[in-house]
Amino acid sequence: MPDPTIWQADDGRYYCIATSPRRSLVSDDLFNWRISDISPIDSSSWKAISSISHNFWAPDVTIVDGKRLMYITLYNSSEDSNIAVLQESSPCQFQYKGIITRGRETGIEDTIDPEVVTDPQTGKVWMFFGSVGGIHRVELSKDGLSIKEGAKYEHVAGLTVHQCPNRSQVFEGSYLHWHKGYWYLFVSSGFYGNHTYQLQVGRSKELTGQFLNREGKPMIEGYATPVLHSDEGDNFFGPGHCGEIFTASDGKEYIFYHCHVRDSHHPGGRPLFMSCIQWDKDEWPYIEGGKPI
């Protein structure tokens, strides 16, 4: 389940989809998951998006203006990458609504990994996205189905791969989480296929503000605070591209993400992981031990 997104449906159950979302997982309690019999994208929508690309990456499911939407990457190349939006048409099934941004039009390399959030203070809807061309932010229309007319794309985090070929300060997989007065921007850096891939974070008091790491250095310059990592040779390696944070029935908060398993029967796969996330005295997130278990 690479690049997962999780949401709680109207029936109270939790659903998870990931890159190439031809199936979904369902859970009653966040701890025990099974394969759902619901296809998350209807057949006509599969036909529509397949005419644009055969790579469907990193979905993000969220509620905008009272409707549940799915944002997803349609990837052909770093230059020809697009973000599409789908709307829930029946419980946990989504229908294609269109492309909302195209990398060929904006010039932003790797227009991928969308994360959409509504600012409760202003009601404005924002999309964060990107990878090797930097993490960008842009305002969406109120209904979340298009870029707001006249909106500007702003680079907010991460160096480009041209500035940092080893990707240690190149970010992707944005996820935003509100906690005690701050917006936390979780990102992943490194190469997703090896141990260098890791989860990091910065924060800002406003969605439109500057995101900083623990030392006060700007994420736009490639700085972030580590949350989860692995070392070369670890059985669980390359943790990152987190999904959402939820509070479970035990009262603890858990973060979801993908991770490689070295001794797996499917070594190329990236199963779904979850870890308990805690907050230190300065309200910075951490995971005990700093590694997936």
Show the residue positions of the predicted features.
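Carbohydrate-active catalytic/glycan-binding domains of CAZyme proteins
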Residues: 1-293
